[in-house]
Amino acid sequence: MSVSIILMGLFVGALVGLTGVGGAALLTPLLIVLGINPSIAVGTDLVYNSITKLFGVASHWRQKTINFKLVKYLAIGSIPSASLAIGILHLFPAFHQHQEEIIKHALGYVLTLVAISIIVRLFLDRKLRPNRWQLMPLENKRALTILIGVVFGFIVGLTSIGSGSLFAIAMIYLFNMKASQIVGTDIAHAFLLVTAAGILNASFGSVDYMLAANLLLGSIPGVLIGSHLSPRFSPRPLQFIMASIILVSGLKLI
């Protein structure tokens, strides 16, 4: 048992509970700063995220705020794409020999993208008006939805980051859904995606189970504490601060 890792999990969990900002964008760069190899950081974070998102799925299932058809179309694209990204890194010698460097630089670019997406989401929540994409039925957007899954799934498979934030921004813009449905659908799809990617990483030996367990010991109470305190704080300033921190982390890794 590592007290420092548990405390880090508590810190990240509390921030997630307070702001709703994805834990992977905060946790993965922190693990790398602590000296964890990027490939292990990514694999461990995927497993950790799978377990934490399971609780979210159970809650939204009870609330009936999951659009299962949308989850299906996103997963059709994202899970094979994430598997492809992981396979490329581990099965092709040219990539496997340089995977730590590839993952580190990819993390930098994706963290920057995630930070921008969080800021854009703050803007869209206030300013976005109904557009022609939102007015289309889901069946008419099936190919586009699967394509979004392919693109963002590859990113998640490579870096563990974006299973929530990147897909959420796409759902806000493309689908006319209540905020609770966006969150529930996003978490349900993210659970399937990170679980599949986590299992595949585990098969390649890229998961530190003790590290994941210590993180969970801290993050679960952290999320509960953050969620309890969140009504006392305005979420937008906190989310903007977190986006700024993620942006700086990303730029340092590029």
UniProtKB/Swiss-Prot annotation:
TM segment ranges: 5-25, 75-95, 105-125, 143-163, 187-207, 209-229
GO cellular component terms given for this protein: plasma membrane
Keywords attached to this entry: Cell membrane, Membrane, Transmembrane, Transmembrane helix, Transport
Signal as UniProt keyword: no
InterPro entries: TM_pro_TauE-like, TSUP/Inactive_protease-like
Subcellular location: Cell membrane
Topology of this chain in the membrane: Multi-pass membrane protein
Taxonomy, superkingdom: Bacteria
Family stated for the protein in its record: Belongs to the 4-toluene sulfonate uptake permease (TSUP) (TC 2.A.102) family.
PANTHER family hit by this protein: MEMBRANE TRANSPORTER PROTEIN MJ0441-RELATED (PTHR43701), MEMBRANE TRANSPORTER PROTEIN YJNA-RELATED (PTHR43701:SF2)
Protein name: Probable membrane transporter protein YjnA
